[in-house]
Design a protein with these regions (language model features):
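Accessory terminal helices/loops
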Residues: 1-12, 117-118, 131-133, 139, ...
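Conserved beta-strand hairpin/beta-sheet module of binuclear metal-dependent hydrolase folds
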Residues: 19-68, 186-189, 193-199
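Active-site metal-binding motif and surrounding structural segment of the metallo-beta-lactamase
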Residues: 22, 45, 56-101, 157
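Divalent metal-coordination and catalytic microenvironments
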Residues: 28, 41, 51, 65, ...
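Hydrophobic/aromatic beta-strand patches that form the interior of the parallel beta-sheet core
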Residues: 30, 77, 98-100, 156-158, ...
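Metallo-beta-lactamase
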Residues: 47, 54-56, 107-175, 224-236, ...
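Short acidic, glycine/serine/threonine-rich loops at helix termini
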Residues: 88-91, 104, 109-116, 121, ...
Length: 412
């Protein structure tokens, strides 16, 4: 059986909310797609909303859900505290709405707020254009003044599990600490056997989870991720409603995909630990560790090599025992000018070009960056541009592609 990721859209298809109508994806469950899908659960005693999108997406979600059912919003359930889940809270909730989140929501929110400038600047390379286009489209529909980003909040918290009954609908909220955030949870509808997992397994299902993000975040523990995958698999859902794209249907398919994902993360973890105990350095393991064919998963959002490094550093920290200088605040760039003076900018650039011509773009980047650190050398800049283009040609990963594209612009 082919891995499911091969037949589903990739990260490039993720886009801000724009739907004219909500889509009924299961009986009484409606989806408004966006940077993270928002879902509406209808009941005989009011509505339940799952996730609210970004602040500027709120009017879209509200409008399409109101067209389905205009009864009061009894609850808003937040599956994780990322901005694209909580931003539309103020637009989606009514005066008496209760917001429900996992008990770690304040811990997660406080991280985001204290690091807001840092994280915003480090995410811009991947999202700024997409956000600007989405905002412009929504402004055409709802006017120039769109709602600001809402702050995370919760009236009810879920420690491990919490059951709600709204009208005829039974809802179970289950903490999943191995999701993308420490306040992750899934929504389980036991009567329908539907699990709203959103981005618990990452924004595009069937791809290796990010155990750390290159935009900057705390490490995510591989064993906790495995426990979370198994917790959802044990529910035996017949429908999985994720954060993006169409539902995944069929108990056997869902079980097979969650088993594949669990075993892939376990394999990466175990091989990394074995390599550490054998005395191998992290870059060697990043190069060597690959999944067996039967555990193939996508790398459109996370990457195997990045997860190997995340597992290593989550266990071992930042000191790799490769150089005394790791312990001190003087990096290799401190002697770039010395190397350029000794070897010559042109000679280093020529050698970088030779590496590139022989299919070694990373070695080319190392040498060319020595030159550009001290001199705006046009030849070195051309090497850097072409080396990044070489890497981009082989990239299937959202974050890697965005970074490489931005670097190509920088050196053009």
């Amino acid at each position: 059986v082919q891995p499911i990721y091969r037949s589903r859209p990739g990260a490039d298809a993720m886009a801000p909310a724009s739907a004219e109508h909500a889509e009924e994806v299961a009986t009484g469950i409606w989806c408004s797609p966006g940077l993270t899908n928002s879902y509406l659960l209808t009941t005989s005693d009011g509505r339940v909303v799952v996730n609210t999108g970004m602040g500027f997406e709120g009017p879209v979600h509200r409008a399409v859900f109101d067209a389905v059912d205009s009864s009061p919003v009894r609850y808003i359930l937040i599956t994780q505290g990322h901005y694209d889940h909580v931003g539309g809270l103020d637009t989606l909730r009514d005066a008496d709405t209760k917001v429900v989140a996992q008990a770690n929501w304040e811990y997660w929110r406080d991280d985001n707020e204290r690091l807001l400038p840092y994280r915003a600047s480090r995410s811009a390379f991947a999202f700024s254009g997409r956000l600007a286009d989405g905002i412009a489209h929504i402004q055409q529909r709802f006017g120039k003044k769109l709602p600001a980003q809402s702050s995370a909040a919760a009236d009810i918290v879920v420690e491990d599990r919490l059951s709600l009954t709204v009208g005829e609908r039974r809802i179970e909220l289950i903490a999943t600490p191995g999701g993308e955030t420490t306040d992750s949870m899934v929504i389980w509808l036991p009567d329908e056997r539907v699990c709203l997992c959103s981005n618990t397994f990452g924004p595009i299902f069937g791809h290796i989870p990010n155990l750390v993000t290159i935009r900057g975040d705390r490490y995510r523990d591989a064993l906790t991720v495995i426990d979370t995958i198994e917790r959802v698999r044990a529910l035996a859902p017949e429908v999985l409603l994720t954060g993006h794209f169409d539902p995944i249907r069929g108990a056997d398919l869902i079980d097979a995909e969650l088993t594949r994902l669990r075993d892939a993360v376990q394999y990466l973890h175990d091989e990394t630990v074995a390599g550490m105990n054998a005395g191998k350095d992290v870059r060697t393991l990043m190069r060597e560790i690959a999944l067996p064919e039967e555990l193939e998963v996508g790398q459109g959002y996370g990457k195997l090599a990045w997860d190997v490094r995340a597992i290593w550093e989550n266990y071992s920290g930042w000191f790799h025992h490769s150089s005394t200088t790791e312990l001190y605040p003087v990096g290799p760039e401190a002697v770039s000018a010395d190397l350029v003076e000794l070897a010559g900018a042109d000679a280093l650039t020529d050698r970088a070009r030779a590496h590139l011509n022989d299919g070694r773009p990373l070695e080319a980047i190392h040498l060319a960056e020595l030159v550009t650190a001290t001199d705006d050398h046009s030849g070195a800049r051309r090497v850097l541009k072409e080396a990044h283009e070489h890497l981009l040609a082989d990239s299937v990963n959202f974050w890697e592609t965005a970074w490489l594209t931005k670097q190509i612009e920088r050196y053009t």
